[in-house]
UniProtKB/Swiss-Prot annotation:
NCBIfam families: L13_A_E. SUPFAM superfamilies: Ribosomal protein L13. The modification Phosphoserine is found at residue 77. The keyword Ribonucleoprotein applies. The lineage of its organism: Eukaryota, Metazoa, Chordata, Craniata, Vertebrata. It is found in: Cytoplasm. It comes from Pongo abelii (Sumatran orangutan). InterPro entries: Ribosomal_uL13, Ribosomal_uL13_CS, Ribosomal_uL13_euk/arc, Ribosomal_uL13_sf. This is Large ribosomal subunit protein uL13. Associated with ribosomes but is not required for canonical ribosome function and has extra-ribosomal functions. Component of the GAIT (gamma interferon-activated inhibitor of translation) complex which mediates interferon-gamma-induced transcript-selective translation inhibition in inflammation processes. Upon interferon-gamma activation and subsequent phosphorylation dissociates from the ribosome and assembles into the GAIT complex which binds to stem loop-containing GAIT elements in the 3'-UTR of diverse inflammatory mRNAs (such as ceruplasmin) and suppresses their translation. Belongs to the universal ribosomal protein uL13 family.
Amino acid sequence: MAEVQVLVLDGRGHLLGRLAAIVAKQVLLGRKVVVVRCEGINISGNFYRNKLKYLAFLRKRMNTSPSRGPYHFRAPSRIFWRTVRGMLPHKTKRGQAALDRLKVFDGIPPPYDKKKRMVVPAALKVVRLKPTRKFAYLGRLAHEVGWKYQAVTATLEEKRKEKAKIHYRKKKQLVRLRKQAEKNVEKKIDKYTEVLKTHGLLV
């Protein structure tokens, strides 16, 4: 069986429900999906209203034994995961298998920091929300309802960005050196280039 290509999505700047709906569909179709930077996901509506909604959800519990559920996740990645779960038939084998194909992370941990990350235009806030509309960040909401790792995630993200800057500078320098080297040997290999062109090996 062919290896299923992993779809790596950058959650920053996407709307929670719209992104969750698209991810839910993809995992049901058999794609493996990884969503990074879940703390940067947006929720439409002002922050205060969203916080009140989440605090109301925190009050939902089993009176006789709260440890039996419902479970209230505090991390942005788990809040997003639960949103996707609500859009899947997760109590069936098919739904459970689909949910197993989804991975969610706060920040961008290795090896995904070295991979190309994609966006979903249909779920982007700048595309779907009017500029005047209010919105909230999932990371801030999570922090105010009990997520303890906002500062840790922010520090790790800063370190990752610094590393990425250094890597990009080196890459640019290598490209520049390669171009310079090609220019330097261009005249020396002219006669060989002509021979290769006559044989149709170079266009």
